[in-house]
Amino acid sequence: MSTTRSRAPSTPRDATDRERYLALLRAVNVGGRIVKKDALRDAFARAGGRNVRTFLASGNVLFDAEPGRVHAIVSAACARLQPALGAEPLVMLRTAREIAGLLRRGPFAGVDAPRLLKRYIVFLAGTPRRRPRLPVSNDDEGLDLVFVAKRECWVVSRRKPNGWYGFPVAFVERAVGVEGTARNWSTVTKLANLFSGGPVR
């Protein structure tokens, strides 16, 4: 799968002051909210992100920044994206350590993702306002919320009789009272590999 890279203008700060971040944008390239990967990459680079890299078309941006500047960079990038998207996107920000920690958790243990199942993580914009008793299921949509962490939820999506799979974002937002954005388990593992500099298969 292709990725794109860009470099922002040089800065006098030492590279050791910077940390690698993942920005997960909500509702990008759906419902007419279209932004190309090059434009997404350039928005973060021009906002001050370093070593910017995008992955897939679902709004995944990896970049380096000083911890004290990262929120300003995200805010400036979102302002640049507003004309294309019609509104500034909601962004869920995570560090490499946080993404690696997701892979060490075991909520999907025993869920081998056969052809009739999909696995998702919903990244939340904040801590859950509600902590429902688990699992929470929506049989009409074939969705099961199986685990709620500090800012992530694990969801299994079962194939419906019509052959479609339910998408978990609205389901999770109703359950925990916080907005979020979903990525399937395969994408999460590939993003973790990108963080570590490994290959993406």
Task: Annotate each PLM feature.
Residues 1-11:
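Short Lys/Arg-rich cationic patches that frequently serve as NLS/NoLS or arginine-rich RNA/DNA-binding motifs
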Residues 5, 14-58, 62-201:
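Surface-exposed, charge/polar-rich loops and edge strands
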